[in-house]
Amino acid sequence: MRKIIHVDMDCYFAAVEMRDFPEYRGKPLAVGGSRERRGVISTCNYEARRFGVRSAMATAYAQKLCPDLILVPGRMQVYKDVSSQIRAIFSRYTELIEPLSLDEAYLDVSDCKLHKGSATLIAEAIRRDILAETGLTASAGVAPVKFLAKVASDLNKPNGQYVIPPDKVPEFIRTLSLRQIPGVGKVTAEKLSSLGLNTCGDVQTYPKQELITRFGKFGAVLIERAQGIDDRGLSVSRERKSVGVETTLAQDIYTLEQCQQVMPGLIQELSTRLSRSAKDRQIHKQVVKLKFSDFKQTTIEHRSNDVSVMMFYELLAQAIARQDGRGIRLLGVAVGLSDKSLISEVDPLQTQLVLSI
């Protein structure tokens, strides 16, 4: 039986700001873009959450909910540096670490001999080390499978942990809301609820073939999760799958011509990022993303081993066709990266954007 820990830092970006600037403590604080630049909230502290402020919320709306909200732009390099400290703490206990972001990770401590091999005690030790060495609190979930460890890490926040022993999984899973399963979003949860499926126990008694017919591969995965099954190992090597750049516009724009004026700057920055961080990786697709004034978004992609600037403009035209009269608040471009490195025979121009095309 595996021993999986999911560690999740508590309101990470905001916590770093409160650590470094004590005057923010006890006051509603958010890290994000300004309302003048039509930004969104990256994260916020618990004082702000009491007003209904949430991550990914438009800054303007967050400030309506909480007029006294303190907004700071964020210091990404500081967050990365602290994340490296935390990663070093993890490595004292196991080499099997799957980082999900700067502030959360899975750890497989099945073979760890420290603290008598107890995953519960190991999680407690990791959280103590993080607090002592970074001044930040972390929450943790402990379970025999990944998705339950992630669910558990949310159950005793902040600065706590929750353990689901193997023999308690059937009892725990039976009443678990489907909305708590990672990957089940609001729309999917509503579709499941319309079928009378609200808990894992409901799924356990529902005809399996009907679920698979209705939901395909997701239905098959849901059946497993509803029984507490998750055979996924940790992805210890997590090479980035894409490189992209996007911009939130100061004002909504509405026409293809206006979007085309934004593209050269995005493409130039994408070229810079590719040459800096993915120059030896094979490209397999190009992507254009639009976010509209109602915060819904669309992406158009084209699969190819070659990168063409003109293709970005063609994808943009296809994306604009989905506009339906809405304003455009965000525009982005990206390329998908394959797992393979480029071989020497491949034209090096395939790894960069040729801006003269």
Curated annotation (Swiss-Prot):
Residues binding Mg(2+), per UniProt: D8, D103
Active site: E104
CDD domains: PolY_Pol_IV_kappa
Names of the cofactor(s): Mg(2+)
Root EC class: transferase
Enzyme Commission number: 2.7.7.7
Subcellular localization: Cytoplasm
Note on cofactor: Binds 2 magnesium ions per subunit.
Domain UmuC: 4-185
GO MF, one example: damaged DNA binding
Site (Substrate discrimination): F13
Signal peptide: none
Family: Belongs to the DNA polymerase type-Y family.
Subunit structure and binding partners: Monomer.
Matches recorded under HAMAP family: DNApol_IV
Protein name in the entry: DNA polymerase IV
Organism for this UniProt entry: Shewanella oneidensis (strain ATCC 700550 / JCM 31522 / CIP 106686 / LMG 19005 / NCIMB 14063 / MR-1)
Name of the encoding gene: dinB
